[in-house]
C-alpha cells in the first residue's frame, strides 16, 4: 500500500461476506427494525407537544426530555458499538430494540398516568425523563451494531450502498410515523406508542430467529484493541459528524416557527405547513439514499461534497426568499443534501479502520451525530435574535465543513480502497456464530 495513505486507511485484510441472497434477507430484517425506530421518533415529535400542554409541561421541559436522552446517547453509542465488536452484533441489536420497546411503552404509560391523575403531577416530568433516558442509555446500540453488521458483510466497494440502505430505513420510518399516528390515534392518543412498542418486540424476535451472524465475535475483536474517539483515524470524522448533525437540526427545529414568524402563518395552520415541510425533507432524503447513492456509484468523498453543496443551497433559500413554495424546495434540498452527506462520510469512517473495529467506529460516529440535538437550546437562542440567524449559522458551518474536509488528510483520502483486499464469500454451510 502506498505510504501516503497508510495513516488513513485500514490495513489490507481478507474480507468475508455472506452470500447475496442472505445479505438481502438480513438487510431486509435490519431495514424493518430501524424503520420501526424512525417511526417512533416522529410519532413522539408529533404527539408529545399537544400532550405536554395537557400535562401542563413547559416548552423547556418538553425539549429537555429529548436533550437529556440525546446527551446520554452521545456517551453510550460508542460504548455499545465497541461491545458489538466483542459480543457480536445480534446481542447488541436485541438489547437496543428491547430497550426501545420498553422505553416507548413505559413513556406512554407515564403520560397515561399523568392524564388520569394516577400519579402525583410532580412525578410525571421526572418519570418522563427516566423512561426516555432508558432509550438513550440502552437503545443507542442498535444503529451502530446494525451499521457494523453491514460493514461485516459488504465489500469495501459495496459499503456506501449498504450503509445508505440501512440509513434510509430510519428515514422511511420518519415518513411512516405520521401515518401510524393518524391510523391509531382514533383508538387513543397514546395508542401509536403501544403499537410501535409491539412492532419493536416483533422485530427483535425476527432478529433472534432469522438474522444470520457467522463471524465469531472473539475472532472479530481482539481484547487488547479498543478504538478511542480521539484516534487520529476517527477524530476528523467525529468532528465532521458533530458539525453536520448540528447544521441538519436547524431546519428540523425552526421551520415551524419560521413559517409563523416570517410567512405569518396562523398558529392553528402551522402544523399543516410543518408537516408538508417535513414530508418534503424526508422524501428527498429517501431519494438520496435509495436512488442516488444506490445507482450513481459515486465515491464516498464525492457524495459528501455533493451533499454539503446541496444543503448549503437549502440554507440560501431560507435566507433569500420568503415564499412557502420556495421554502419547501429548500427543505427538499436540505433532505437531499444531508441524505447524501451522511452515508458519504459514514462510509469513509468505516473504511478508515480495520474490520474488527467496525462496531467501535459506528458507535463513535453515532454518538457524535447525536450532538446536534443537544445544540437545540443554542439554535433556539439564535432564533430569538432573528429567524434568519440559525440558517446563516448553518450555512457558515457547512462551508467550514467543506474546507475542513479538504484540509484533513483523513477526510480527503476517505473512501480510497486498498487494491490488495481479498474478498471471500461465505457459503451456506458456514457455521453460524452463536448470538
Ranges and model annotations:
Residues 7-24, 212-239, 423-435:
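Juxtamembrane intracellular "pre-TM" segments in multi-pass secondary transporters
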Residues 35, 116-141, 326-340:
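Hydrophobic core of transmembrane alpha-helices in multi-pass small-molecule transporters
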Residues 46-61, 253-273:
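Short amphipathic helix-loop junctions that connect adjacent transmembrane helices
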Residues 71-75, 273-296:
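Transmembrane alpha-helices of Major Facilitator/SLC transporters
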Residues 76-89, 287-300, 383:
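Helix-to-loop junctions at the C-terminal end of transmembrane segments
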Residues 98-121, 310-322:
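C-terminal ends and interior cores of transmembrane alpha-helices
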Residues 129-170:
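Cytoplasmic helix-loop-helix junction between adjacent transmembrane helices
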Residues 300-345:
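C-terminal transmembrane helical hairpin of 12-TM major facilitator-type secondary transporters
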